[in-house]
From Swiss-Prot:
Its EC number is 6.3.5.-. Gene3D superfamilies: Glu-tRNAGln amidotransferase C subunit, N-terminal domain. Heterotrimer of A, B and C subunits. Keywords: ATP-binding, Ligase, Nucleotide-binding, Protein biosynthesis. HAMAP family: GatC. InterPro entries: Asp/Glu-ADT_sf_sub_c, GatC. Coiled coil: none annotated. This is Aspartyl/glutamyl-tRNA(Asn/Gln) amidotransferase subunit C.
Amino acid sequence: MSVNDKTIKRIAHLARIAIHDNETERITKKFNAILDFAKQLDEIDVTGVDPLISVIPMTLRTREDSITDGNKAADIVANAPVTEENFFLVSKIVE
């Protein structure tokens, strides 16, 4: 696959980028170089190679999930102007 000036102008239009006519040739060459590199990567035989998830092998420490209120309800509502039984009280806005 290769890119031509018409394609560059269309991409620029879709991206809402102003490109002058004297720039299209340079940008076309850069796009084609990127596509050629991607084609080279596509030609590499990776059969039998395990997918690389991370460069450094890591295992995450896990913990058992437990549901709690955090024992911080009083701290959370401490700055509220009006509360009742650890709930925020607000004025009625909509009838």
